């Protein structure tokens, strides 16, 4: 996607003297060149993925494929709340530092540890998961999530999974997916790197389905 997770992973691997291999869609390699150079400076090998739409979803597929082919010496590290359990849960808990900091900063600045509204963008869902994590069961807080509408949810050029998706399986997770009637994954469209994922983290699919979060498709 945008490459931030790749930079973070490359940094940790450099500190731990471990080999690091990053899979990134060729389209994203071009438009996020600065982050690619950071990864390389940290010693990571960056593999441009040239299949499909050459973006986030294709990079995830290649990373999982490589992991499955080399289980004896490879650990898969994903940066969003996607993939098979327990990955979505691990990522959400790690990202929950965002809402943890929100609580004490709000207490310090306004005298209470909760806001009226939380607003976050959502692609795979990691940043949004971290933002809302400690407030999910707090009904005083309204949750709004913004997903990329692309050219519009009534077109074939959109990444608004929670508006246009149906229940299915992508990268080992059962969630809302942009797919054809026979379950083939459709390509998501948006100019925003990191939001062009044709699925959504299961946590967000659940919250949206039961009305806990309000999802807006931003054009």
Range-by-range predicted roles:
Residues 104-113:
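Phosphate/pyrophosphate-binding loops at sites that engage ATP/ADP/AMP, CoA/4′-phosphopantetheine
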